[in-house]
Amino acid sequence: MSKRDYYEVLSVGRDASEREIKKAYKRLAMKFHPDRNPGDKAAETSFKEVKEAYEILTDSDKKAAYDQFGHAGVDPNRGGGGFGGNADFGDVFGDVFGDIFGGGRRGGGQRQAARGSDLRYNLELSLEEAVKGLTKELRIPTLAHCDTCDGSGAKKGTSPTTCGTCHGQGQVQMRQGFFAVQQACPTCHGRGKIIKDPCNSCHGEGRVEKSKTLSVKIPAGVDNGDRIRLSGEGEAGEFGAPPGDLYVQVSVREHAIFVRDGNNLYCEVPISFGKAALGGEIEVPTLDGKVNLKIPAETQTGRMFRMRGKGVKSVRSHAVGDLLCKVVMETPVKLNERQKELLREFDETLAGSSSKKHSPKAEGFFDGVKKFFQDLNS
């Protein structure tokens, strides 16, 4: 049977701290401890499940492998790069309290075969891929429907029989003091069926481990944290039950030039002192190629220019963001003597009473400093 997501087992988020994980473990371990639930096989199973989840999520190496590859990353018998493992996005509480209160969502009738687990695949994209969209081939390790037994778990020509202990319910009732509690049937392990002659291919599970390749269309404009759901592409369900879903989790690598914020892109463009003072045109990179940007005379370093429609097209609407270019004036380096002399001459022309009109910000700054010291000494 497929394992539940470890974070779900402990009822914590994927960003939970080690302290939060330990706190959740202590609470659940106390709840399901065998000493507090004598003879309760369901509680014993839950206790083992909680303990296993805790051991994985508090070991930094195992946790990193699990976060990247899911159960495949911590199970030596399974593997698959980029694969995110089981991630059951269903109702946590139905699973936790189901055995105690008569099967939770399953109701009081015959035990239904479990739906397949949801899967998660971590997909890393470049900024260009995320902005423009593309089709990706993904190789997914999963549990697939066994073709040999057609998912029944029984050898061809035979069929599962109804469990005589629970009469197909998958649960038995036990009394603990004043309370009557239900737990998984110890004979059929909650399945409601007994397979006397199991299939040689799946060993009675009705599912086999396989890898499948999917062609997934990534829409233009996706961003970090976006999740694409592929219905029915998760693990096969138990004994013919519906399959789970596949969730493709998108992350976008940092770009060497651009920073994305929503649908807008930001970049810094270096300009020379002469270009900033006299104005002119500069080349600016965009995701569609270079474009010219007109710089007015007397442009100060840090000024932001907006190029409308040069950002990212929204994945959820027809809106297109802008490209915001911040110009940064560079101080020239490795000057020869002639260049230094010219700069000295230029600097001298700015000195004196006329310097204020050439450096309005400097004038305001030094006037403020002068007033500060006057107030300090008064």
Swiss-Prot record:
Cofactor(s) annotated in UniProt: Zn(2+)
Residues involved in Zn(2+) 1 binding: 146, 149, 199, 202
J domain sequence ranges: 5-70
GO-annotated biological processes: chaperone cofactor-dependent protein refolding; DNA replication; protein refolding; response to heat
Matches recorded under InterPro entries: DnaJ, DnaJ_C, DnaJ_domain, DnaJ_domain_CS, HSP40/DnaJ_pept-bd, HSP_DnaJ_Cys-rich_dom, HSP_DnaJ_Cys-rich_dom_sf, J_dom_sf
UniProt function note: Participates actively in the response to hyperosmotic and heat shock by preventing the aggregation of stress-denatured proteins and by disaggregating proteins, also in an autonomous, DnaK-independent fashion. Unfolded proteins bind initially to DnaJ; upon interaction with the DnaJ-bound protein, DnaK hydrolyzes its bound ATP, resulting in the formation of a stable complex. GrpE releases ADP from DnaK; ATP binding to DnaK triggers the release of the substrate protein, thus completing the reaction cycle.
Family (UniProt): Belongs to the DnaJ family.
HAMAP family cross-referenced by the UniProt entry: DnaJ
Identification of the protein by name: Chaperone protein DnaJ
